[in-house]
Amino acid sequence: MEMAKEQELILVLDFGSQYNQLITRRIREMGVYSELHDHEISIGEIKKMNPKGIILSGGPNSVYEEGSFTIDPEIYNLGIPVLGICYGMQLTTKLLGGKVERANEREYGKAIINTKSDELFAGLPAEQTVWMSHSDKVIEIPEGFEVIADSPSTDYAAIEDKKRRIYGVQFHPEVRHTEYGNDLLNNFVRRVCDCKGQWTMENFIEIEIEKIRQRVGDRRVLCAMSGGVDSSVVAVLLHKAIGDQLTCIFVDHGLLRKGEGDMVMEQFGEGFNMNIIRVNAKDRFMNKLKGVSDPEQKRKIIGNEFVYVFDDEASKLKGVDFLAQGTLYTDVIESGTKTAQTIKSHHNVGGLPEDMEFELIEPINTLFKDEVRKLGIELGIPEHLVWRQPFPGPGLGIRVLGEITEDKLEIVRESDAILRQVIREEGLEREIWQYFTVLPNIQSVGVMGDYRTYDHTVGIRAVTSIDGMTSDFARIDWEVLQKISSRIVNEVDHVNRVVYDITSKPPSTIEWE
């Protein structure tokens, strides 16, 4: 993302750590803009971006493995502060002349370190708890470096070259298990890099609107409206930037929540005076999905069909060159990067055909979900719309496990409406990050009245989270869960059992498919 010259930037280089997005997230929480880029970024690109600081993320590899990730050592000569985290510290040590070796056993979990530094650890207790996760260890630091923290298991828990402003820590300050991790990152960003912390959603809007106007010119844009928070925010942002050059295409694929289609037309078509075309493509999608049970295949089919529908609609319009989507940072990450294994393909980034005729515009693909909500409020979208439940592009298609049928969709649609109603009545909307029902491909025996039943099981998924990268199951009061269960079993046909998902992310993802 191209930033205005006055915008402070902390550049995070990705070496494949499962935590690397958290680094970016923590820095943004300080009001400083941060981006995650591949470790192969060139020196020229870095100079052009003009970051105030560079952070080298952790990673699962050893610095001595064949083909292990590395960087251009010239990074250390740019005069820009550098902080290496775990793998980033080991790589820094190796590239600058120190020594690293394979540890006898992997160090994983909490550890106590003792610190001594007036920069990274300024204002922090000398003894603190951190989260270790590494298999290599530093045995000799480069010339010019000093030890600023040690632990019972390592003499080099943190190091610094204060003159060149190069630092390394053998633990993960970005995870919440590290007691003063945010404070350490804040010291690096504020004290070492001298960032003022002026990144706001207001700034983001100004920059993004200018980018959109420069790129689009007098051409036209189609926006994929799904009814979810992300695509709604994208539509309003684009409308603010280019007005009537925007045409929103709302594809009603028959996989929407109860009442979703009418709500979209009323709130955005009438409320924001947008040009929205509603396309009834239910039969088209259902025919494509008939007999398909594999979740990845379902996502690909839905993503492809979305684009083909857009193609059909665009052919009826003149001068449409761009397709806008509500892709988030987490969507891009979960679809896999050079250093990250694909967890699941996201329909916005993984299902697009190679011969697609549109150029993509993804104006919020560097934002996390909570940042998108803040952006929505700043854009003037009513709170009740901004705080609507996240809804994936494939819709209920990935909340019906296995093959999709009309009857199964109706079960999920009605049970989900009951869940959302009870959560709202109990005042839990803001406490729970995301909640929805799923229909596993499971039937079980039950008794209703005097009769034996053999019907469907509905699963409830409700999680708490800050940014969607990690989550835990919500501790909903048992009486509330009982109310939800009772209503679903009594009001939704062909359901005789309700279960509650008590799994965190990781190891599970929030969605079941």
Curated annotation (Swiss-Prot):
Native source organism of the sequence: Staphylococcus aureus (strain bovine RF122 / ET3-1)
Chain ranges of the GMPS ATP-PPase domain: 199-388
Record-level GO cellular component terms: cytosol
Binding site residues for ATP: S226, G227, G228, V229, D230, S231, S232
Top EC class of this enzyme: ligase
Keyword set, alphabetical order: ATP-binding, Glutamine amidotransferase, GMP biosynthesis, Ligase, Nucleotide-binding, Purine biosynthesis
CDD domains in alphabetical order: GATase1_GMP_Synthase (cd01742), GMP_synthase_C (cd01997)
Domain Glutamine amidotransferase type-1: 9-198
UniProt xrefs under Gene3D superfamilies: 3.30.300.10, 3.40.50.880, HUPs
Gene: guaA
Entry superkingdom: Bacteria
NCBIfam families from the UniProt entry: guaA_Cterm, guaA_Nterm, PRK00074.1
Record's subunit section: Homodimer.
Record's keyword annotation contains ATP-binding: yes
Pfam families on file: GATase, GMP_synt_C, tRNA_Me_trans
EC number from the UniProt entry: 6.3.5.2
The name this protein goes by in its record: GMP synthase [glutamine-hydrolyzing]
Pathway in which this enzyme or protein is active: Purine metabolism; GMP biosynthesis; GMP from XMP (L-Gln route): step 1/1
Record: active site: C86 (nucleophile), H172, E174
Function: Catalyzes the synthesis of GMP from XMP.
GO molecular function: ATP binding; GMP synthase activity
Catalytic activity, reaction form: XMP + L-glutamine + ATP + H2O = GMP + L-glutamate + AMP + diphosphate + 2 H(+)
